[in-house]
């Protein structure tokens, strides 16, 4: 069987410039929708993790209060040592705890949350690491 050259009509098969531009425009629209949604999802995830870390800390904080009758002198290292608290690495005690109140903070992926405890078994979450 002899080799025969393929005859063409002068046009190559492929996509035109207009077709490629339309596909790029569609991809751009999809990215404009997907990227903000993804960023919002990751931010909500980080907030949820920070809140969960703080909730896990509160039983140790209240156990400290039950043992000592005050929050004064409470430290993260002391909570870890005395109450076997599985405290997350980002958890910190802000300021100096008083006899009746404390502030525990957690920063997860740049999102700061705080728990301000005005007394035994009562607390409130605040965003932006604000305990005041």
Where are these regions (language model features)?
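N-terminal single-pass transmembrane signal-anchor helix
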Residues: 11-38
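Conserved catalytic core of two-component sensor histidine kinases
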Residues: 24, 51, 58
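N-terminal leader/signal peptides at the extreme start of proteins
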Residues: 1-15
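Aliphatic-rich helix starts adjacent to a transmembrane/signal segment
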Residues: 37-54
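Regular, well-ordered alpha-helical segments
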Residues: 32, 40-43, 59, 63-66
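Periplasmic/extracellular, small/polar-rich flexible segments of pilin-like filament-forming proteins
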Residues: 59-132
């Amino acid at each position: 069987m002899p080799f025969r050259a393929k005859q063409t009509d002068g046009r190559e098969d492929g996509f035109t410039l207009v077709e490629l531009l339309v596909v790029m425009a569609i991809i751009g629209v999809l990215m404009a929708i997907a990227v903000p949604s993804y960023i919002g999802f990751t931010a909500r995830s980080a907030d949820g993790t920070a809140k969960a870390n703080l909730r896990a800390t509160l039983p140790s904080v209240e156990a400290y209060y039950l043992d000592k009758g005050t929050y004064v002198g409470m430290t993260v290292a002391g909570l870890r040592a005395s109450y076997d608290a599985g405290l997350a690495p980002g958890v910190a005690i802000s300021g100096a705890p008083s006899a009746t109140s404390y502030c525990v903070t957690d920063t997860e992926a740049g999102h700061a949350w705080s728990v301000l405890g005005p007394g035994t078994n009562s607390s409130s979450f605040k965003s932006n690491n604000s305990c005041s």
